[in-house]
Amino acid sequence: KGHRRIAALTADPDDSSISQLRYSGYARALRELGIPPEEEDVICADDFTVESGCRAMRERLKRPADFTAVFAIADDMAIGAMRALRESGRSIPEDCSIIAIDGINVSEYIHPMLTTLCQPMTAMGTKSVELLLGVIRGGAHDHLTLPTTLRAGESVRDLTK
């Protein structure tokens, strides 16, 4: 929604395929929009937890921060980052927007409600079991992409208005 300086809150992309995939999708989307990903705006957390997201954002905010939005690779990390942003005197979404991936239920109950890309958790579980059983029976490992939905919360400010 008009943001040009977007920080990425990720777990170490060298340690996790989930981090690698989500970060590479984020970076590709930025490049497609003509926005070069800035290395200084990559915030690496230790893991995918609320605590780790909070710690990583606190550490990043010790340096000047001119990003207007944060993309977190997990809802839990975003929730932690929101706390650190508020502690630093920033208001969400007025001073900094935040969006994440997962669609966990608690993201609907925090304030402001987190904007998140929801994964089809039940379908993921079902398809995982089906794929595993197929492999056990000697079948090929299929690549599967499941649809996601955007749950628009209250954590993103529209800068185009």
Report residues per predicted region.
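Bacterial carbohydrate/catabolite-sensing allosteric modules
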Residues: 1-161
